[in-house]
Amino acid sequence: MQGTERREERVLRDRKGRVARKLRVSVTDRCNFACLFCMPEKDKISWIPKEEILTFEEIERIVGVLASLGIEKVRITGGEPLLRRDLEELVDKIASIRSIRSVDMTTNGWHLERKAEELRRAGLRGVTVSLHSLRSDRFAKISGVDALPRVLRGIDRALGVGLNPVKINSVAIRGYNDDEILELIEYARERRISIRFIEFMPLDGLGMWNYDRVVPGKEIIETASRVYPLQPMGRGASETSSTWRFKDGRGDLGLITPMSEPFCDDCDRIRLTADGKLLSCLFDTEYHDLRHVVRNGGTQKDLADRIVDAVWKKPDGVGYMPWIKDGWAKPRNMNAIGG
């Protein structure tokens, strides 16, 4: 029967036939920024208790089982991952797992200037830095921290030590930074690095999301193409972004469009939260507790069975979530999921 075949294959296949190959590991829900599209108001923040956060050894064990089931690429996230002390030790542990092909990280860049070299030595391949404005006052308004020069130094340091790829992610929000699209593109082009614009998603802690604030990817590419000759490269299988290459060879532009053009049909990503919950979809409302298995004597097979079952139940996609179709945001924070 179908259920039996799923278990015998021992791969992370869901009901739609999608196979998970990429994992995002959140190592903390804490962040020293307060980006308005991510974090709730300070008096409404409830951090995960320290004793509930997975240890590096527990993460290593879970990732090892996931690797045996076909996970090949790992991205370390937060909150802000570099708030986790000695993160390079975890990078080394994950990079040493035989079938893991790459370990990358997404960061706000605050600690990147200081940590880039040792992370690279530990086995970090590349880094994606969140950068939503190049204007100091606006950067502070969006992120809650006056830190633009420090973040920019972190990006340059990452390039200097040889992390590759270095990418920029920018969330485009109508009325906040949609007039900076060309400035952000030019900044990335000067460094010949990729920049990806992300549509504003209904996962903000402040509850400010609505469709009127979403800048569709089509609008972004129209803005860019009026200035820069672009060559469409399409969207690779299971990739989150559609890509355009600048014809003069100075980097490329990506669009991540979960709202206007969802890419759920061939999604190959799953997420592990900082407190050990497996999330098969960014917009899912069902968590699968792996920490309980790890801390209560579960065997490797127990862990694998729980993971395979969780992935099998992966939702069809964002377009099928009734709370999104109805146009309102779920009261759930991106920092707690893992960005």
Regions found by a protein language model. Name each.
Residues 27, 35, 76, 105, ...:
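Conserved, mostly hydrophobic/aromatic
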Residues 22, 26, 75, 106, ...:
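Conserved beta-strand segments that form the floor/walls of ligand-binding pockets within enzyme
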Residues 33, 136-137, 262, 288:
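Glycine-centered loop/turn positions within well-structured domains
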